[in-house]
Regions:
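Sec-dependent N-terminal signal peptides
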Residues: 5-14
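Carbohydrate-recognition beta-sandwich/jelly-roll modules
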Residues: 25-232, 256, 341
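Active-site-proximal substrate-binding groove within the catalytic cores of carbohydrate-active enzymes
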Residues: 41, 198-201, 366-601
């Protein structure tokens, strides 16, 4: 008989039913009660889990532990069945910012970075993380668990079904802040930037030799060639300012290479339908001004303005006059000119060579260095507003969580390491910037594919005429960038993020620090789950040959069904497989494989489109099968051939393809799939239909288009 135990209730400070979004959540366990076989966890006065505990008559021992280690609170409720199995099934209720995920790395698994677009039903998920309140509830290994999202209005509900000889429910409040050590992460005060950020930067194209004419030509090419595909930002990165940098006039009154002035440049960029983006930094190299206004700068032991490598004279962020005279005028004027994207450079040097290297100055004044540092960037944010995009550069900046929209996670030049070393930060803490991509380089397809599938910041940096060549395909098929959430709230390779606390005691920013993201890839598999109301599918990018066979269960897919596997870049259908598939060799032209994986159905079905590396994630709005017809709606780019890749099982005869708002240019079978090519002169939303004749006996009409698992036994 089930042993009923009432767990001790812990009184919360928040009033029942009140959930003040601006207030910090309590750093304490939930109230836990077990009555009549029903377990309820209540946090901030609201139930976050309500479930039933079943054991089939076996005696169940219940234990609870709530403890604090290194300021991080953990609460565990463990159910152990004596000679049988125990099952805990119920609902997790959280905010609309909650998502299903993994919170702890599994043992002996292939390293793989997971992301999701839309509510995720991946069978690897063992937890629900509520970003708005920074808590996570999970089930410990080795219990078998399925976490599935449900639709909700003002909250998000997930079903949680766990079974085993032992089931342990674990609750961790203030997870990123305390358990991950991000003390500045207060997500109840801000939301992550959701729109796609894709565009062009002048740095590797022109370095500091960029001219106004270069920007004008690039704007022309970008607006005609890449803007229709989602590249909307044009960023001037250095080269426009006068020297020495520091005084506002030298930032705002451009040098002779920009004779029309920054205001005109911004208007010209915007007139082409692009977002004007600009680079600045927080260095100060005007010695005459610094010596004339020493109170506006951090001072050394002799009382003179302190100097540091890269940063020059160190602006004192605790001095209101410094902010008023040197910082606010720059960003207020640029905002008024029309600039909407601000990259702020040299922030690592302000922290390391500036504030950390002059710790005694702040200590003597009773000031926290990190607070003063954060206030500098907060001032910039307050001036430009939250409608403008703010990028911190460069290196990991834990002090700026909640102030900036994105962080350039590594050194100059595109880096792969951050995709796996800071995967849990992306679009939760900030958006990761791996730095600019040169599509003229050999790894262009690999770089754009991974950047897009992980939901990272995507900026190109080539001479614009490169985009008039076929190399532009690597860029066109990667934008816009989907808003994704991490499938893991741990880092796949924790070697960097585990040392993030060292930022507080670092004195030099000359080169990457041990906690900055690496340039080398830290994983070879990158999985994106695309979840739409009409269909669920997976996209797997592979960049290494260390996985000659891939099991579908490794990808979190049910192992009891067949899947179609199609490679996007080579346009090759590998076939239909059960349990596993062999990806084969990576084509050296692309240096990446981009597999579209959909559950194989008994009727004609869409396998992919050619529009985007997400295999339809940005362009498909509906796909249905009914009355011997495959129909859907897609967003087309004007003048760009749009290809529907359709798998046709035996027993169906193609009749015709038709479209509303686009012309059907061709329809042909090649490589085991039908390719229906559409073209629209004006672009936009298009309806299409592919009609068949003949239906296998017994196949029901209106069969779902590959839905996520819906019950516990589906794995």
């Amino acid at each position: 008989m089930f042993q009923r135990i009432l767990l001790a209730a812990l009184v919360l400070s928040a009033a029942p039913g009140v959930r003040a979004q601006a207030a910090a959540p309590p750093d304490m366990p939930a109230t836990a009660s077990l009555r009549a076989d029903t377990l309820v966890l209540t946090y901030e006065g609201r139930p976050i889990f309500r479930g039933v505990v079943q054991s089939g008559g076996a005696r169940v021992d219940v234990r609870m532990l709530a403890d604090t280690v290194n300021d991080a609170v953990t609460q565990v409720i463990k159910f152990t069945a004596s000679g049988g199995r125990v099952r805990v099934s119920g609902d997790v209720t959280a905010s609309t910012q909650a998502f299903a995920c993994e919170v702890d790395p599994a043992q002996d698994v292939v390293p793989m970075v997971r992301t999701a677009s839309g509510p995720d039903a991946n069978l690897l998920n063992r937890a629900v993380y509520d970003r708005a309140r920074d808590w996570v509830i999970s089930v410990d290994f080795p219990a078998h668990v399925v976490v599935l999202p449900k639709a909700g209005a003002d909250s998000t509900t997930f079903s949680l079904d766990a079974e085993g000889g032992e089931v342990a429910i674990r609750f961790r409040p203030r997870f990123y802040e305390m358990h991950r050590g991000l003390r500045a992460f207060h997500p109840w005060t801000y939301t992550a930037w959701r729109p796609s950020v894709a565009g062009w930067s002048s740095w590797y194209a022109f370095f500091d030799s960029v001219t106004g004419r270069d920007v004008e030509h690039t704007a022309d090419v970008l607006s005609r060639v890449l803007k229709p595909f989602g590249y909307t930002y044009l960023q001037i990165d250095d080269g426009y300012q006068r020297t020495p940098v520091g005084p506002p006039a030298n930032w705002l009154d451009a040098n002779a290479k920009f004779p029309s002035g920054l205001g005109v440049v911004a208007r010209d960029i915007a007139a082409r339908g692009l977002q004007p983006a600009i680079w600045t930094n927080v260095a100060f190299h005007d010695s005459a001004y610094a010596l004339a206004h020493p109170d506006e700068f951090v001072r050394d032991t002799a009382g003179a303005p302190a100097w540091g490598n890269w940063i020059g004279f160190v602006m004192d962020g605790a001095n209101a006059a410094t902010m008023r005279d040197l910082v606010v005028p720059v960003y207020d004027s640029l905002r008024r000119m029309g600039w909407t994207y601000f990259k702020v450079d040299a922030l690592r040097h302000l922290r390391y060579e500036g504030y950390n290297s002059n710790a005694d100055y702040f200590r003597a004044r009773g000031l926290r260095r990190d607070s003063v540092y954060r206030s500098v960037v907060q001032t910039i944010r307050d001036v430009i507003g939250h409608a403008s995009f703010l990028l911190a550069c460069w290196g990991i900046r834990p002090e700026l969580a909640g102030v900036v929209d994105a962080v350039r996670v590594g050194d100059d030049g595109f880096g792969y390491g951050g995709f796996a070393e800071y995967n849990s930060f992306n679009n939760v803490v900030w958006r990761n910037d791996p730095d600019h991509i040169q599509i003229a380089s050999a790894d262009a397809y690999r770089a754009t594919t991974l950047t897009s599938l992980t939901g990272s910041l995507l900026m190109l940096t080539d001479r614009p005429d490169v985009y008039l060549t076929d190399r532009a395909e690597a860029a066109k098929r990667a934008a816009p960038v989907l808003f994704t959430l991490p499938g893991q709230i741990y880092d796949v390779n924790p070697s960097r993020s585990s040392r993030i606390g060292e930022a507080a005691v670092t004195l030099s920013g000359a080169g990457p620090r041990p906690f900055d993201a690496d340039k080398r890839p830290a994983a070879s598999l990158y999985l994106l789950d695309v979840n739409r109301p009409f269909e669920h599918w997976s996209v797997l990018a592979r960049i290494g040959d260390d996985t000659p066979r891939i099991r579908f269960s490794t990808l979190g897919l049910p192992a009891d069904r067949s899947y179609l596997v199609y490679e996007f870049w080579t346009q090759h259908l590998l076939g239909a497989f059960r349990e596993r598939f062999s990806p084969g060799a990576i084509d050296p032209r692309f240096q990446v494989q981009d597999f579209c994986i959909r559950e194989a159905l008994a009727h004609p079905q869409l396998v992919s489109t050619n529009r985007h590396v997400s295999c339809g994630g940005v362009d498909l709005h509906d796909v249905q099968w009914a009355a011997d017809t495959l129909r859907g709606e897609s967003d087309l780019v004007a003048g760009d051939d749009y290809v529907l890749v359709v798998h046709e099982p035996s027993g169906f005869r193609f009749v015709r393809a038709e479209a509303t708002g686009a012309a059907v240019m061709s329809s042909a079978v090649r490589g085991g799939v039908r390719r229906v090519r559409l073209r629209s002169a004006g672009g936009g939303r298009v309806g299409w239909r592919i009609v068949y004749r003949g239906l296998p006996h017994g196949l029901p009409q209106g069969q779902p288009m590959g839905q996520p698992p819906s019950h516990f036994a589906s794995q």
